[in-house]
């Protein structure tokens, strides 16, 4: 028992040192401004240990601590300012009106901190309350581990944080590291910091890292930060942003007013809605833009009113671009991005195109839609371009078509030149014949005059 007493005392003084190192209003875990220095922080005024100086601020939060009386076996009280260590091997190292009411409880200091669960610890602060077993409040102001079921829970510091159990569901293993008015109501939850964040009673093993007015009301949900974000179904995640809502196994990395309720869906940007399973919806911040919404499962929708570029090389020398307002892709074709440039024979290309089989067909996945074009195997065998014999890139198809068109144009030009030459020769002959006929007409006219 003497060992238990010494251990409790050592823990108490360690917690005091931890609180002092954290500075006013915080522990190592952080929190909003509040006094955690115990009696040393009280002003030296007349009256019941300076209590009048606190009346205006603290009246609404008074715990009537301590809630127990008497002296526990092997207990220790470091000061006489209304502190009570009623539990076995309990310790109150200092402060004012603190209570360590159950077995092995420790209050390091502060004002009106109270413990009624076993093996609890409060490092300091004001008006902190622990009723669950094996639970800890590091400091702060008005924090509460409120029910006996909240065992193995932790509040680091802050202001009016709560680990609650309104529906009598076990809320063991929960942590509120700091902040103000944060609340967790289910098992194994974590709130890192922030203001008015809420974990619902069915949201076991959920987490809110920080931010303001965020909520997780389903198990295994996560909100990283931001404001007014909500996870409504299990395993959903919101990274941050404002006013976002995620459903089951859905993800919103951030942005504003995005909704991802489809199972396994993703929404990002501003005003995106992914309400079908497997949807990916991303919307830009274009002024006055219409809301972007998925219309079927497993869609990929994106709006970038300033244009889209996909690069397929690390040096940004190959890729495709969809220009702002455009309806077709533009391939990167800068001469500076190319090498091993050699000329081609347009006539050879045309000859190969002439012998290339062209068919009408449907993809096996869209049997109701017809297309016209070559097979990749025939195209690769004819021209030996592209990555393999299973794909035809539009840049290769366009290049072949342009070369064939050039060859056809050259043929037409040669034929036109030949026809022009023939026509010119005929015109010359016609002109000669016309001159001959004119001369003959003159001669005939002269003969007629001489005969008269």
Tell where the protein language model's regions lie, with residue ranges.
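C-terminal intramolecular chaperone/autoprocessing and neck/assembly modules of extracellular spikes
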Residues: 298, 304-404, 408-452
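Periodic small-residue-enriched repeat registers in elongated scaffold domains
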Residues: 37-321
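Boundary at the C-terminal end of the N-terminal hydrophobic targeting segment
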Residues: 28-30, 48
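Bacterial signal peptide processing site
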Residues: 22-25
């Amino acid at each position: 028992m003497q060992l238990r007493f010494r251990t409790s005392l050592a823990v108490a003084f360690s917690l005091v040192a931890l609180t002092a190192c954290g500075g006013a209003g915080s522990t190592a875990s952080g929190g909003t401004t509040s006094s955690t220095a115990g009696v040393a922080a009280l002003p030296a005024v007349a009256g019941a240990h300076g209590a009048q100086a606190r009346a205006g601020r603290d009246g609404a939060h008074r715990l009537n601590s301590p809630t127990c009386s008497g002296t526990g076996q092997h207990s220790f009280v470091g000061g006489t300012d209304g502190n009570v260590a009623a539990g076995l091997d309990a310790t109150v190292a200092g402060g004012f009106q603190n209570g360590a009411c159950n077995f092995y409880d420790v209050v390091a200091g502060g004002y009106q901190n109270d413990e009624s669960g076993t093996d609890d610890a409060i490092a300091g602060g004001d008006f902190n309350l622990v009723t669950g077993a094996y639970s800890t409040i590091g400091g702060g102001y008005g924090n509460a581990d409120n029910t006996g079921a909240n065992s193995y829970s932790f509040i680091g510091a802050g202001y009016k944080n709560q680990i609650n159990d309104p529906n009598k569901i076990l809320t063991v293993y929960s942590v509120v590291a700091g902040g103000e008015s944060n609340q967790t109501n289910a098992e194994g939850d974590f709130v890192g910091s922030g203001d008015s964040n809420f974990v619902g009673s069915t949201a076991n093993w959920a987490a809110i890292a920080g931010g303001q007015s965020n909520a997780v009301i389903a198990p295994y949900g996560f909100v990283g930060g931001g404001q007014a974000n909500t996870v409504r179904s299990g395993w959903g995640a919101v990274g941050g942003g404002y006013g976002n809502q995620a459903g089951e196994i859905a993800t919103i990395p951030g942005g504003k007013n995005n909704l991802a309720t489809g199972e396994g869906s993703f929404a990002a940007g501003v005003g995106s809605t992914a309400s079908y399973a497997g949807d990916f919806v991303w919307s830009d911040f274009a002024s006055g833009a219409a809301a972007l919404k998925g219309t079927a499962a497993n869609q990929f929708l994106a709006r970038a009113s300033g244009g889209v570029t996909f690069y397929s090389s690390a040096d940004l020398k190959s890729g495709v671009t969809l220009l702002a307002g455009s309806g077709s892709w533009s391939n990167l074709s800068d001469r500076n991005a190319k090498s091993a440039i050699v000329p081609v024979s347009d006539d050879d290309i045309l000859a190969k195109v002439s012998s290339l089989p062209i068919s009408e067909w449907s993809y096996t996945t869209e049997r109701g839609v017809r297309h016209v074009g070559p097979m990749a195997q025939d195209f690769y065998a004819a021209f030996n371009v592209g990555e393999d014999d299973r794909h035809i890139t539009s840049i290769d198809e366009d290049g072949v078509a342009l070369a064939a068109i050039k060859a056809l144009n050259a043929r037409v030009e040669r034929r036109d030149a030949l026809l022009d030459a023939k026509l010119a020769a005929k015109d010359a002959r016609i002109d000669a014949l016309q001159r001959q006929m004119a001369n003959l007409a003159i001669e005939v006219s002269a003969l007629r005059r001489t005969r008269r």
